[in-house]
Design a protein with these regions (language model features):
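N-terminal Rossmann NAD(P)H-binding glycine-rich loop of SDR-like oxidoreductase domains
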Residues: 3-23
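Conserved glycine-rich Rossmann-like NAD(P)H-binding loop of the short-chain dehydrogenase/reductase
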Residues: 25-36
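NAD(P)H-binding glycine-rich loop region in Rossmannoid oxidoreductase-like domains
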Residues: 53-92
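Active-site Tyr-X1-5-Lys
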Residues: 123-126, 137-165, 194
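C-terminal substrate-binding subdomain of Rossmann-fold SDR/epimerase-dehydratase oxidoreductases
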Residues: 202-204, 209-320
Length: 320
């Protein structure tokens, strides 16, 4: 049996592919943009498909060819690109997810694992705790597309019996991230310090943002996919990330344990701060993910940064 990963050349998708290859799975990777260095060391151990999620015929062809036991649907546009180009975000995120689910229905693929986001939360949050059932009223195009896709997945689950499961990721941190988004400073500050380059962090030192290391993000998808169907009651699961949630100042302090001379300055951006201000003072409760399928992150803030630098040292070609 095989598995299909959309967005397979991305930060999480490429790590997920590596993990699946190591498990002996037959892996098919689909992406619009191919980045060959992502798979250095495992070339030839996967089947690569180049396709746009907005092209239904290409998605049908990919699902028919791969005939996977499960589709990991990670492909899509992130927050800032989605807000800058909402039309493309609709075509990629909304129509693209419909194409994946409809292809799964047509070719009798019974399981779809979807990556959503905590950006589905926005207005009218009743602080101080957000959980899986908190009102989802996003303030961005990105968050809006993800709410729709969660609901579409639930519809396909109810009407067609597709075993749809989803996680709502916090900010995912890892080396080699290229696309700007509203919390990318958590990754770029770490990476710029490694390369000896200055970096302006676009939030205040006190700003707290939930983060999850990319290896934990990929591992969460494996755990969710492997859970027995009867355990999956909540369907769409919030992941809180590293606990306790660190501030931007604490991130910088942890980086400077490795690179004391790192040139990291704070230059808050009004748009970014408007977004982040709505989530300050909030605790994220992911206890149902732990209860229903055994979720628990392995990396602390310090462990994440140490492994981040280990990855950059061991695999420089993969992340540049």
């Amino acid at each position: 049996m095989s598995v299909l990963i959309t967005g397979g050349y991305g930060l999480i998708g490429s790590e997920l592919a590596r993990m699946l290859v190591e498990k002996g799975e037959k892996v098919w990777v689909l992406d619009k943009w191919l980045v060959p260095q992502r798979f250095t060391g495992i070339e030839g151990k996967m089947t690569i498909l180049q396709a746009d999620l907005g092209n239904f015929s290409k998605i049908l062809e990919a699902v028919k060819k791969s005939s996977p036991k499960a589709i990991f649907h990670l492909g899509g546009m992130l927050s800032l690109p989605s807000n800058a180009d909402p039309q493309s975000a609709f075509a990629t995120n909304v129509a693209g997810t419909y194409h994946v689910l409809e292809a799964a229905r047509l070719f009798n693929i019974l399981k779809v694992i979807f990556t959503s986001t905590i950006a589905t939360y926005g207005l009218d949050i009743q602080k101080p705790v957000i959980n899986d059932f908190t009102l989802q009223r996003p303030i961005t195009m990105y968050g809006s597309t993800k709410v729709f896709c969660e609901l579409l997945g639930r519809f396909y689950k109810t009407k067609y019996g597709i075993d749809f499961r989803a996680v709502r990721f916090p900010s995912v941190v890892g080396p080699g991230a290229k696309t700007a988004h509203i919390s990318i400073y958590n990754a770029w500050a770490v990476e710029k310090a490694f390369y000896g380059e200055p970096y302006d962090i676009f939030v205040t030192p006190e700003t707290r943002c939930p983060v999850l290391y990319f290896k934990d993000a990929a591992r969460s998808l494996l755990l969710l996919e492997a859970a027995p169907a009867e355990a999956i009651q909540t369907v769409c699961y919030l992941l809180a990330g590293i606990k306790p949630m660190n501030s931007a100042a604490e991130l910088v302090a942890a980086i400077r344990k490795h690179f004391p001379q790192a040139i990291l300055n704070f230059k808050p951006d009004p748009l970014a701060m408007e977004f982040h201000s709505k989530s300050q003072g909030i605790t994220y409760d992911d206890s149902l993910a732990e209860k229903e399928w055994g979720w628990k992150p392995e990396y602390s803030l310090e462990g994440m940064i140490a492994n981040f630098y280990e990855e950059l040292n061991r695999n420089p070609e993969r992340y540049r």
